[in-house]
Amino acid sequence: MPIQPSGKETEEMEAEGDSAAEMNGEADESEEERSGSQTESEEESSEMDDEDYERRRSECVSEMLDLEKQFSELKEKLFRERLSQLRLRLEEVGAERAPEYTEPLGGLQQSLKIRIQVAGIYKGFCLDVIRNKYECELQGAKQHLESEKLLLYDTLLGELQERIQRLEEDRQSLDISSEWWDDKLHSRGSSKTWDSVPPSKRKKAPLVSGPYIVYMLQEIDILEDWTAIKKARAAVSPQKRKADGP
């Protein structure tokens, strides 16, 4: 058989059941109160969020405008500073004090010195070449002059020797002719000359025709003419040989 609880225990169990029911009722009431307060707080927080958003938005806009203004001021200030620096550099460049100008200028001056030295050396070499060429030309001209002088001397010597030889031949022929003429004059045995005879007593030249040559001159004149012709021929013959030569 099952054991039944006693009366005291039954009362305790009923009391516990009533207390649990009361506790459940209180819990439900507290939950309702909590949910109501939470709803009210949510409504209040939403209203506060909108106001805070607008306030923060206006603050951000004002800060952005302020930053833009500051940025414009800084940009203008930076522009003025850069402009003043550029003007100062321009003045330094004009006065040849700027490092951007003096350093490249020093390099250019050094390059100029080197190029001047190279140009001087090249000038010396060119002068040496011109001097050597001048000396060679001068030596060649002197040698050509000496050779031309020797050639001219030999030519003139040959011509003079030929003329002397011809003069010797002419002199010998003249000596022979003069001896022949003297012998002829002495053989006449008359003191009268041809010139002393009056023209009326001179014999007239015979009149001939054909290839005969009539000499109206005296023998001495003919001899002189013959000597002059030989001298002229002797003087003309070297020039003719020179003209016929290369």
Swiss-Prot record:
Cross-link (Glycyl lysine isopeptide (Lys-Gly) (interchain with G-Cter in SUMO2)): 184, 242
Name the UniProt record assigns to this protein: Breast cancer metastasis-suppressor 1 homolog
Role, per record: Transcriptional repressor. Down-regulates transcription activation by NF-kappa-B by promoting the deacetylation of RELA at 'Lys-310'. Promotes HDAC1 binding to promoter regions. Down-regulates expression of anti-apoptotic genes that are controlled by NF-kappa-B. Promotes apoptosis in cells that have inadequate adherence to a substrate, a process called anoikis, and may thereby inhibit metastasis.
PANTHER family: BREAST CANCER METASTASIS-SUPPRESSOR 1 (PTHR21964)
Segments of skewed composition (Acidic residues): 11-32, 40-52
Domain notes: Contains an N-terminal anti-parallel coiled coil formed by two BRMS1 chains; this region can form homohexamers.
Chief site of localization: nucleus
Organism field: Rattus norvegicus
SMART domains tied to this protein: Sds3
